[in-house]
Amino acid sequence: DDFNSIFCFEIPPGGKSRPMKHIYENVVYVMEGYGSTTIETDDGQKHSFEWGRNSLFAVPINTRYQHFNGSGQEPARFASVQNFPFLINTFRNEEFIFNNPMTFPERLGPNGYFAGEGEMIELRPGRHQWETNFVSDITNFELKSWAARGKGSSSLRWILSDGTLGCHTSQIVSGT
């Protein structure tokens, strides 16, 4: 569509992605495999973290990053949701998107956000949020009760790298 896109990427065994830097948001869900990502800001700050199946993370906008497959035997596969279509259609300028000198230090958050630390933002059922940059395994993260969605249902919204791409995890009991 014209706003967001989703791509599936595969990094071969022992492989790595090209280094990238762009102004669009990028949320990554790891479907298979394990590895690491290194992020570097223009002032030389580096952050690295390891991910595996069911990890969820966002690369802070306009930082350099590279993904590495930690297995020499199996590929790593992940889905990447981006707002690239909206930005390229708005600005129609690849130089602006891929070579923009603007920095966004507020998108980095505290250093612990790259290690899975974060902040719970209690709003109302169905709207509770966890703010971080990285979640090691969304299937083992405590969701918040959402009784209005059905008995036993729960949900949690993710704010990743202070971004605007909304995502959530919900557990809805069968038959509700």
Predicted features along the sequence, with ranges:
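A short, N-terminal "cap"/entry segment at the start of jelly-roll beta-barrel domains
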Residues: 1-2, 95-169
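Conserved short histidine dyad/triad with adjacent acidic residue
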Residues: 5-22, 151-155, 165-176
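Glycine- and acidic-residue-biased ligand/ion/polar-headgroup-sensing regions
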Residues: 12-13, 22-42, 173-176
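A generic "binding-loop/recognition-motif" signal
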Residues: 23, 63-64, 84
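A short hydrophobic beta-strand segment most commonly corresponding to one strand
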Residues: 27-29, 58, 73-93
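Short acidic-glycine-tyrosine-enriched beta hairpin
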Residues: 41-62
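Asparagine-centered strand-capping/turn motif at beta-strand->loop junctions
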Residues: 68-70
